[in-house]
């Protein structure tokens, strides 16, 4: 098992809210695949593919604590906060919550603190809009954020076109649209 499998199993145990777990897995796999496409299309970026893949799989871990019934989230927090909430959840895990002991059984899946801190940052910063001060900064954070804009949780397996992704950002204001356009120039398909 990969580290994200342990973490997802911990926060989304099978049989608890299987509809939300499946939605998270499908969405995250789609984002991970798209993010890895960026890494492979743009090796000049020097992005760490393991950080990108794992970050994409964990970027939405915080939705379980949010209130968004239309996508099976029955928590109490506003959905806009799912990124920082996910970062807090990963910090709890990193500091040794119950899952830490399980990882000792499989040394291959035991990341160091630096790796998990990178995952926390990706969670906190992946929305890229709506939360001042939490904009993605590293190349890996930006790639996950960019890839995430092409997928929704209402139709998780359908990849949006560039224009559809752009339109979905307009409600958050022009600055986010301009950032996405810049990312598309940097991360989009080569001509």
What are these regions (language model features)?
Residues 1-79:
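Acidic/His-rich, divalent-metal-binding segments that scaffold phosphate/diphosphate chemistry
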Residues 7, 13, 63, 106, ...:
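Short secondary-structure boundary micro-motifs
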Residues 19-45, 58, 93-98, 115-117, ...:
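Divalent metal-dependent phosphate-bond-processing catalytic cores, especially two-metal-ion Mg2+/Mn2+ enzymes
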Residues 43-54, 96-126:
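Acidic/histidine metal-binding catalytic segments
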Residues 62, 107-110, 187:
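Intrinsic structural disorder/low-complexity segments
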Residues 65-84, 91-92, 96-107, 132-137:
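Metal-dependent catalytic cores of enzymes that make or break cyclic nucleotides
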Residues 85-92, 118, 122:
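Generic beta-strand or strand-like secondary-structure segments
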């Amino acid at each position: 098992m990969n580290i994200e499998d342990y973490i997802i199993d911990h926060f989304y145990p099978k049989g608890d809210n299987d509809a939300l777990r499946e939605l998270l897995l499908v969405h995250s796999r789609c984002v991970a695949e798209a993010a890895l496409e960026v890494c492979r299309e743009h090796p000049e970026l020097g992005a760490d593919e393991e950080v990108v893949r794992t970050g994409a799989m964990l970027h939405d871990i915080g939705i379980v604590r949010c209130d968004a019934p239309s996508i099976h989230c029955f928590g109490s927090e506003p959905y806009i906060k799912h990124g920082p909430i996910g970062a807090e959840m990963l910090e709890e895990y990193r500091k040794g919550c119950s899952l830490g002991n399980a990882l000792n059984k499989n040394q291959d899946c035991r990341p160091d603190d630096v790796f998990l801190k990178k995952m926390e940052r990706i969670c906190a910063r992946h929305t890229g809009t709506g939360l001042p001060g939490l904009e993605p900064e590293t190349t890996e954070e930006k790639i996950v954020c960019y890839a995430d804009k092409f997928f929704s949780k209402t139709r998780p397996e359908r990849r949006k076109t560039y224009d559809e992704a752009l339109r979905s950002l307009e409600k958050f204001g022009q600055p986010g649209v301009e950032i996405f356009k810049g990312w598309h120039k940097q991360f989009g398909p080569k001509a």
